[in-house]
Curated annotation (Swiss-Prot):
Top-rank taxon, per record: Bacteria
Pathway: Purine metabolism; IMP biosynthesis via de novo pathway; 5-amino-1-(5-phospho-D-ribosyl)imidazole-4-carboxamide from 5-amino-1-(5-phospho-D-ribosyl)imidazole-4-carboxylate: step 1/2
CC terms in the record's Gene Ontology section: cytoplasm
Protein name stated in the entry: Phosphoribosylaminoimidazole-succinocarboxamide synthase
Assigned keywords, A-Z: ATP-binding, Ligase, Nucleotide-binding, Purine biosynthesis
Documented EC number(s): 6.3.2.6
Top-level taxonomy: Bacteria, Pseudomonadati, Thermodesulfobacteriota, Desulfovibrionia, Desulfovibrionales
Catalytic activities: 5-amino-1-(5-phospho-D-ribosyl)imidazole-4-carboxylate + L-aspartate + ATP = (2S)-2-[5-amino-1-(5-phospho-beta-D-ribosyl)imidazole-4-carboxamido]succinate + ADP + phosphate + 2 H(+)
Source organism per UniProt: Maridesulfovibrio salexigens (strain ATCC 14822 / DSM 2638 / NCIMB 8403 / VKM B-1763) (Desulfovibrio salexigens)
Group of enzyme by EC: ligase
Record family assignment: Belongs to the SAICAR synthetase family.
Biological process terms in GO annotation: 'de novo' IMP biosynthetic process
Underlying gene: purC
Length: 299
């Protein structure tokens, strides 16, 4: 059984933040160390026990996509192997190998860049009420989970840990970023999504929607954080897909279903996740990794 990492402890570096999944350290004025742990959250609440290998799976899916998209947009990556990190980090190999990246310290944009290729989730609820999704007027008669003719760029604010992001209009996002930067961000978001969506579909996965994060480094727009993972995206199996109903997913579905079953009130502290649910969840993440990358997980 693999050793899981719930929380890192790098004594020589300053811990900048411990999010729902990632621990972020400052290496120097120009570099950060991002560690993807095996923590899992549902409904914005972190569960007490981890999912084995989840951090490695998410980290390595992101590396796979960043490489695929580097001709569309540069990324923040400096190194992903502990041997290439500053020597002071080598003794923490157990906590870092396969699940961490050394990155450029970019200035993050103040918005989350969400793209919706299929109508589902909160977008479906809004459409039923208003015929719109985040200010985009859509044709009448769409079914739940139907593919949209063109993917929608629907930015949101960035909420603090435990809070919910809020959708904002394209006008508001343009105001926050300025027209030139907004246009670049929208174009990059849609280009990356379309390429990723088309590739994944051939491999048996529908990417229904996702969110990206961008930053500015040396005056240049770059992609940061995670890219097209089961945590930042809604993955559905191509097999059995049919518009007109909700779809099974490649992520925390087992966990969410179990929490619904036990009437979890969506407030911390969360209950201990049974081993069977944790194993099924790991298997789903692993299945997405294998289908997309067609490679073995780097231990």
């Amino acid at each position: 059984m693999s050793k899981h990492v719930v929380e890192t402890d790098i004594k020589e570096l300053k811990l900048l933040s411990r999010g729902k999944v990632r621990d972020i350290y400052e290496v120097d004025d120009d570099k950060l160390l991002l560690v993807t742990t095996d923590r899992i959250s549902a409904y914005d609440v972190i569960m007490p026990n981890p999912i084995d290998d989840k951090g490695k799976i998410l980290n390595q899916i992101t590396l796979f996509w960043m490489d695929m998209f580097k001709d569309i947009i540069p990324n923040h990556l400096i190194a992903s192997k502990v041997d290439d990190y500053p020597e002071v980090l080598h003794k923490y190999r157990d906590q870092l190998e396969g699940r961490s990246v050394l990155v450029k310290k970019a200035k993050p944009l103040p918005i989350e860049c969400i793209v919706r290729g299929y109508i589902t989730g909160s977008g479906w609820k809004d459409y039923q009420k208003t015929g719109e999704v985040c200010g985009h007027k859509l044709p009448e008669g769409l079914k739940e989970s139907e593919m949209l003719e063109q993917p929608l760029f629907t930015p949101s604010t960035k909420a603090e840990l435990g809070e919910h992001d809020e959708n904002i209009s394209v006008e508001k996002a343009t105001e926050m970023l300025g027209k030139e930067l907004f246009d670049k961000v929208q174009e990059a978001t849609l280009s990356i999504y379309k390429r990723g969506r088309d590739y994944a579909r051939e491999k048996g996965i529908i990417i229904a929607d996702t969110k990206f994060e961008f930053g500015i480094y040396d005056g240049e727009l770059i992609i940061i954080d995670e890219v097209l993972t089961p945590d930042s995206s809604r993955f559905w199996p191509v097999e059995g897909y049919e518009a007109g109903k909700s779809q099974p997913s490649f992520d925390k579905q087992f966990l969410r279903d179990w929490l619904t079953e036990i009437n979890f009130n969506k407030q911390p502290p969360a209950p201990e996740v049974p081993e069977e649910i944790a194993t099924k969840t790991r298997d789903k993440y692993m299945e997405a990794f294998t289908l997309l990358t067609e490679s073995e997980l780097d231990a």
